[in-house]
From Swiss-Prot:
Family: Belongs to the universal ribosomal protein uS3 family.
Pfam families according to UniProt: KH_2 (PF07650), Ribosomal_S3_C (PF00189)
CDD domains: KH-II_30S_S3 (cd02412)
Gene Ontology MF term list: mRNA binding; rRNA binding; structural constituent of ribosome
SUPFAM superfamilies in alphabetical order: Prokaryotic type KH domain (KH-domain type II), Ribosomal protein S3 C-terminal domain
Disordered as annotated region, ranges: 224-250
Its job: Binds the lower part of the 30S subunit head. Binds mRNA in the 70S ribosome, positioning it for translation.
The keyword Ribosomal protein is annotated on this UniProt entry: yes
Keywords tagged on the record: Ribonucleoprotein, Ribosomal protein, RNA-binding, rRNA-binding
Official protein name in the record: Small ribosomal subunit protein uS3
Bias type Basic and acidic residues, positions: 238-250
One cellular component (GO) term of this entry: cytosolic small ribosomal subunit
Keyword Ribonucleoprotein among record annotations: yes
């Protein structure tokens, strides 16, 4: 029987890039991989309330000292920064002590967390841990993702659903999610929810569009980052009011006065 592979790994090197980038000798690679795992574990634990969606680590050797540049994508940058960037500075100092290298931490805001698979899976897991209905949690996540500009979404929850004695899987799907098309930008993530009846597994697939030759993965997600307007449509500023047609308003006022005078007579 054919099994479903991880869409992120299947598209790695085709339309997706690596989240860890380094130039090192072959003998140093195992230690750097272990160090990257420690960095990711530290950031996920300390910034869990900020909604971490992605961590990119890039290593550059500057003169005699090695520099580690980290891009932390979060949905709540205010929590990640803290008052006067106190939380960020504390994290940088701890990472420098952990790695014994210079660390640069860049916090980037995720503008549309409703269509990021990692954050959607985490949101469903939190609702299930708070005893919410697994059907309602999935349907609400699908509605928010489609409203934010996703072209397709699929969710799946597995385990003792509703406290049943026998475990089963139940999921929902809306739109297109082409898993066999390699140029299709499919975002995939998993999460776990710890409930009184055991652990529930959550899987989320979100389709953003096709990445054509000469484009990057950002081009499929960029048109909807600023809002729900269509491709190529400009958003009107809040203070920019539509121009009033004075002649039309005068005609409406004249007709209103005419009917009022006619009723009086």
């Amino acid at each position: 029987m054919g099994q479903k592979t991880n869409p992120n790994g299947l598209r790695l090197g085709i339309i997706r890039t690596w989240e860890s980038k380094r130039y090192a000798d072959q003998k140093d690679v195992p230690a750097l991989i272990k160090e990257d795992a420690l960095i990711r574990e530290f950031l996920n634990e300390n910034f869990s309330k900020a909604g971490v969606s992605q961590i990119e680590i890039e290593r550059v050797k500057a003169k005699s000292k090695e520099r580690v540049t980290i891009k932390l994508y979060v949905s709540k940058p205010g929590i990640a920064l803290g008052k006067e960037a106190s939380v960020k500075n504390k994290a940088v100092s701890n990472l420098e002590y952990l790695t014994k290298k210079e660390v640069i931490l860049n916090i980037i805001e995720v503008r549309r967390p409703e269509k990021v698979a990692v954050l959607v899976a985490q949101s469903i897991a939190e609702q299930l841990e708070n005893r919410a209905s697994f059907r309602r949690a999935q349907k609400m996540a699908i509605q928010r993702a489609l409203k934010s500009g996703a072209k397709g979404i699929r969710t799946l929850v597995s385990g003792r659903l509703g406290g049943a004695e026998m475990a089963r899987s139940e999921g929902y799907s809306e739109g297109r999610v082409p898993l066999h098309t390699l140029r299709a930008d499919v975002d995939y993530a998993t999460a776990e929810a710890s409930t009184t009846y055991g652990i529930l597994g959550i899987k989320v697939w979100i389709y953003h569009g096709e990445v054509l030759p000469g484009q990057s993965i950002l081009d499929t997600r960029k048109p909807f980052e600023a809002g729900n307007q269509r491709r190529g449509q400009k958003r009107r500023p809040r203070n920019d009011q539509p121009v009033k047609d004075l002649n039309k308003e005068k005609e409406i006022a004249r007709r209103t006065n005419y009917y009022v005078n006619a009723k009086k007579n």
